[in-house]
């Protein structure tokens, strides 16, 4: 039987939205830092702000997920490692990822980190979702183009430890 507990996951584009989501009852908050996020021109969080958010959320039993949802060039992987390390040390709960190479890199470099497949990975069905789960993803955010019926079908076909 599937776990029926729902995680209320809220976005936060700035500190005010983060604290608002935490105090409104979100179980988890996802946000972008100042690098490797699709919202490059958004306000986003500085390194210190993000570390403070992680620590604050954990004091209240909440989780924080960081978006790393851009394509990363081969020459940028050492920068990605340095970028993620302070958040990993602070206890970042997971990373929402677009690029399969980034997915494999983070899986290997940060083995305790939860990996989530971003909607930008364009997973459209059970084969893609199952493949990603076998690679270590604990959550798959399906492609935006899918109908609710297609998402429900994919959810029902996956192993019980997967989340869609």
Task: Give names to the regions the model predicted.
Residues 2, 7-28:
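N-terminal basic/disordered segments at the start of proteins
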Residues 4-6, 26-27, 60-64, 92-93, ...:
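Short, well-ordered coil/turn segments that N-cap beta-strands
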Residues 8-11, 29-31, 64-68, 95-97, ...:
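Hydrophobic faces of well-ordered beta-strands that scaffold small-molecule active sites
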Residues 21, 99, 132:
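Conserved, mostly hydrophobic/aromatic
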Residues 30-49, 68-74:
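Glycine-rich, proline-tolerant flexible connector loops at the mouths of alpha/beta enzymes
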Residues 41-51, 100-109, 145-153:
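Active-site-adjacent beta->alpha loops and helix N-cap segments on the catalytic face
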Residues 47-65, 106-112, 156:
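Alpha-helix-loop-beta-strand connector modules within alpha/beta enzyme cores
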Residues 154-160:
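Conserved small/polar residues in nucleotide/adenosyl-binding loops
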């Amino acid at each position: 039987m599937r776990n029926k507990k729902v995680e209320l996951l809220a976005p936060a584009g700035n500190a005010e939205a983060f604290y608002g989501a935490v105090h409104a009852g979100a179980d988890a908050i996802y946000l972008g830092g100042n690098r490797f996020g699709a919202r490059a021109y958004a306000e986003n969080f500085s390194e210190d702000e993000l570390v403070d958010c992680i620590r604050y959320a954990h004091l209240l039993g909440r989780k924080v997920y960081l978006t790393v949802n851009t394509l990363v060039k081969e020459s940028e992987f050492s920068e990605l490692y340095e970028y993620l390390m302070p958040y990993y040390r602070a206890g970042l709960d997971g990373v929402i990822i677009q690029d399969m190479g980034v997915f494999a890199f983070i899986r290997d470099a940060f083995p305790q980190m939860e990996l989530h497949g971003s909607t930008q990975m364009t997973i459209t069905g059970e084969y893609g979702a199952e493949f990603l789960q076998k690679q270590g993803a604990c959550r798959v955010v399906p492609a935006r183009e899918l109908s609710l019926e297609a998402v429900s079908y994919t959810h029902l076909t996956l192993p019980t430890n997967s989340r869609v």
